């Protein structure tokens, strides 16, 4: 049986962070990630529908995940939602998530 202990505890959906222009804020994403770590969150679910993924382009979804991973520094279990309304984009997001 595989160890599933990394999936215990609080694992909320991660909300995207925006700047004054309505663009994804890498700094905001990193700050929210660090805040969640400080508050005892054990993992995050990035890119799901609660995190506005249906409104984001593939490049925006990649950007959010990249900055979550950067700020998490291995301290969080990160679950990357990669589903899209077409297979090619889902495959692209899955390959990107795996590369991080």
Regions found by a protein language model. Give the residues of each.
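Active-site beta->alpha loop and helix N-cap motifs at the rims of alpha/beta catalytic domains
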Residues: 2-12, 17-100
């Amino acid at each position: 049986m595989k160890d599933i202990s990394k999936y215990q505890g609080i694992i909320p959906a991660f909300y995207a962070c925006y700047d004054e222009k309505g663009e994804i804020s890498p700094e905001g994403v990193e700050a929210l990630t660090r805040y969640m770590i400080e508050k005892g969150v054990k993992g995050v679910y990035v890119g799901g529908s609660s995190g506005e993924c249906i409104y984001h382009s593939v490049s925006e979804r990649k950007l959010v995940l990249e900055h979550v991973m950067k700020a998490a520094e291995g301290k969080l279990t990160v679950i990357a939602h990669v589903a899209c309304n077409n297979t090619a984009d889902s495959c692209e997001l899955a390959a990107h998530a795996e590369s991080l």
